[in-house]
Amino acid sequence: MQQLELYHIAFLGLAIVLEIIANIFLKMSDGFRKVWLGLLSLLSVLGAFSALAQAVKGIDLSVAYALWGGFGIAATIAAGWILFGQRLNAKGWIGLVLLLAGMVIIKLA
């Protein structure tokens, strides 16, 4: 088991934030028609993976990746709702609840 420190948790948080930013820029780039926003998206993804690489030095890969992906998806759904007026249907909400439950189970394992 690796030594978990606040440092690793902070890098995981940064990776999550950068993933959300990347997704927002990707949506705003309109399929890379706005090249500079597409490039900002790519840079954000690179930053997210770099931060995740630092996080997994102290957090098990399976836990870090599940939390990164899960929180990234949940927050991207919220950002889509707030910024772009996108709404989930009933199946989408069920999927989000299952995703969050899975993250809790993985963290407790």
UniProtKB/Swiss-Prot annotation:
It is a multi-pass membrane protein. GO terms for biological process: glycine betaine transport. It is found in: Cell inner membrane. GO terms for molecular function: amino-acid betaine transmembrane transporter activity; antiporter activity; choline transmembrane transporter activity; spermidine transmembrane transporter activity. GO terms for cellular component: plasma membrane. InterPro entries: Small_drug/metabolite_transptr, Small_multidrug_res, Spermidine_export_MdtI. The chain crosses the membrane at residues 6-26, 35-55, 64-84, 88-108. Keywords: Cell inner membrane, Cell membrane, Membrane, Transmembrane, Transmembrane helix, Transport. Pfam families: Multi_Drug_Res. Belongs to the drug/metabolite transporter (DMT) superfamily. Small multidrug resistance (SMR) (TC 2.A.7.1) family. MdtI subfamily. PANTHER family: SMR FAMILY PROTON-DEPENDENT DRUG EFFLUX TRANSPORTER SUGE, SPERMIDINE EXPORT PROTEIN MDTI. Catalyzes the excretion of spermidine. HAMAP family: MdtI. Forms a complex with MdtJ. This is Spermidine export protein MdtI. It comes from Serratia proteamaculans (strain 568).
